[in-house]
């Protein structure tokens, strides 16, 4: 959904931050939670749209094989350990991996002043640091 990418760009503008070269962790790329099916998923389009804006996108999904995503959509998946020092975290699909296993670690991936975008309003915003921002649809 290009609107989501533009929305993130608008949030950045209001904060006086440039999206160019910002590190954005995009988490959960499949069609729905806890499955490996990418058919009908808008996530690859969102990742590619953010890249067009000049963002450094660190895509992660525990259910997708890296090779398949590269071949199909031209997106390289990153390891969970690479999700650090992020200017923004964009959770598109809240897999249990993020909600349960990495719930607390997820908020620590953000820099001070970072933006946490929770598309499906699945996370407890009170877990964010005081200078981090929360945004959801």
Give the role of each language-model region.
Residues 25, 33-71:
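NAD(P)-binding Rossmann-fold cofactor-contacting core
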Residues 30, 92-97, 120-121:
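Short glycine-/small-residue-rich Rossmann-like dinucleotide-binding loops
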Residues 1-12:
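Single conserved hydrophobic/aromatic residue that forms the stacking wall/gate
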Residues 33, 96-101, 124-125:
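Short glycine-rich, flexible loops that bind phosphorylated cofactors or substrates
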Residues 13-24, 82-84:
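Glycine-rich phosphate/diphosphate-binding loops that line cofactor/substrate pockets in enzymes
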Residues 107-137:
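ADP-ribose/adenylate-binding Rossmann-like module
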Residues 7, 84-86, 112:
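Alpha-helix C-terminal capping/helix-to-coil transition sites in glycosyltransferase folds
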Residues 73-86:
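Short acidic low-complexity segments
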